[in-house]
């Protein structure tokens, strides 16, 4: 599968353009996910054929901040993408996750509930 970066709660247009320009030389596909699709399985949003869409449409609150989900990245490419995002000047982006065999069945609300509350549990 092709490297894909899913972006939930996309920032304003100027910041989004900075992100796109940073990823372009790396040939990384950026996909902005609409709020109405927040109940879809992450694997489906990433393009995994074994996942089907849900018929539910999300109409709740937006995430508190942008969240990046890195899909199908090898370690060195993940490092390159993270470095490009740091240098682009659109951040900081506190919420980043990697698609795994476990979380590909979740939706972004489940991911964000676990991911965003993690720093709180460490304190």
Predicted regions and their residues:
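A generic structural motif
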Residues: 29-41, 92-105
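Short, structured active-site "lid" loops
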Residues: 45-65
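N-terminal, charge-rich interaction modules
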Residues: 1-50
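Gly/Ser/Thr-rich loops at beta-strand to alpha-helix junctions
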Residues: 9-15, 38, 73-77, 102-106
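Mid-chain, well-packed structural core segment of small domains
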Residues: 59-85
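Single conserved hydrophobic/aromatic residue that forms the stacking wall/gate
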Residues: 114-123
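Short, compact, well-ordered microdomains
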Residues: 80-87, 96-109
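Short, flexible, solvent-exposed loop/turn segments with mixed acidic/basic and small polar residues
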Residues: 1, 55-61, 86-88
